């Protein structure tokens, strides 16, 4: 009998995950201090407001723009006067290969913003410093936790909308 050599068909070659930064840039920036210089004569008891959002756009196959929006506003506790408002849109273009679906969504909502956040944080700190306000050091953000919260909210909304089965 002749021996038959059976070669298993190679599984579809999977492209390894690849994340490359193509460019990081400031898309928009604004700093307002509407009550200067009178605000410097008030006691400095700030109340900080912080808003964070991301926006993604596919530019080409495997090429994405991610924009991190951060708005920081500070008012004085006693008077309610606005000390400053700082709005930053820090953006980046990323090549992302080898993933799709929920993994791609996670990369765009977590890994890319993790790259952008230190740039935005430094820019905000610099703007506040140039306004001659006390130093502002923004805390790190856990984008993985934010993404998981988003997924849980989506799941809860879908479950709430699903018709009840009797």
Curated annotation (Swiss-Prot):
Signal sequence, start to end: none
Subcellular location: Cytoplasm
Keyword presence, Chaperone: yes
Coiled-coil blocks: none
GO BP annotations listed: protein folding; protein tetramerization; protein transport
Cross-referenced InterPro entries: SecB, SecB-like_sf
Pfam families: SecB (PF02556)
Alphabetical UniProt keywords: Chaperone, Cytoplasm, Protein transport, Translocation, Transport
Domain of life (superkingdom): Bacteria
Major location category of this protein: cytoplasm
GO molecular function: unfolded protein binding
GO cellular component: cytoplasm
PANTHER family to which the protein is assigned, alphabetical: PROTEIN-EXPORT PROTEIN SECB, PTHR36918
Assembly behavior: Homotetramer, a dimer of dimers. One homotetramer interacts with 1 SecA dimer.
Family: Belongs to the SecB family.
Its biological purpose: One of the proteins required for the normal export of preproteins out of the cell cytoplasm. It is a molecular chaperone that binds to a subset of precursor proteins, maintaining them in a translocation-competent state. It also specifically binds to its receptor SecA.
The protein's name in its UniProt record: Protein-export protein SecB
Taxonomic source organism: Actinobacillus pleuropneumoniae serotype 5b (strain L20)
């Amino acid at each position: 009998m002749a021996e038959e050599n059976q070669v298993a068909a190679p599984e579809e070659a999977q492209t390894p995950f690849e994340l490359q930064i193509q460019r990081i840039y400031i898309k928009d920036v604004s700093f307002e201090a509407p009550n200067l210089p009178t605000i410097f004569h008030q006691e400095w008891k700030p109340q900080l407001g912080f808003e964070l959002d991301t926006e993604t756009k596919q530019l080409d196959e495997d090429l994405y723009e991610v924009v991190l929006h951060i708005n920081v506003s500070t008012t004085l506790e006693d008077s309610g006067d606005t000390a400053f408002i700082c709005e930053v849109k820090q953006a980046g273009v990323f090549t992302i290969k080898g993933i799709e679906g929920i993994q791609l969504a996670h990369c765009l909502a977590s890994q890319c913003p993790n790259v952008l956040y230190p740039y935005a944080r430094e820019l905000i700190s610099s703007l506040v410093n140039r306004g001659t306000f006390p130093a502002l050091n923004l805390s790190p953000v856990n984008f993985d936790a934010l993404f998981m919260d988003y997924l849980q909210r989506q799941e809860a909304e879908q479950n709430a909308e699903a018709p009840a089965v009797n």
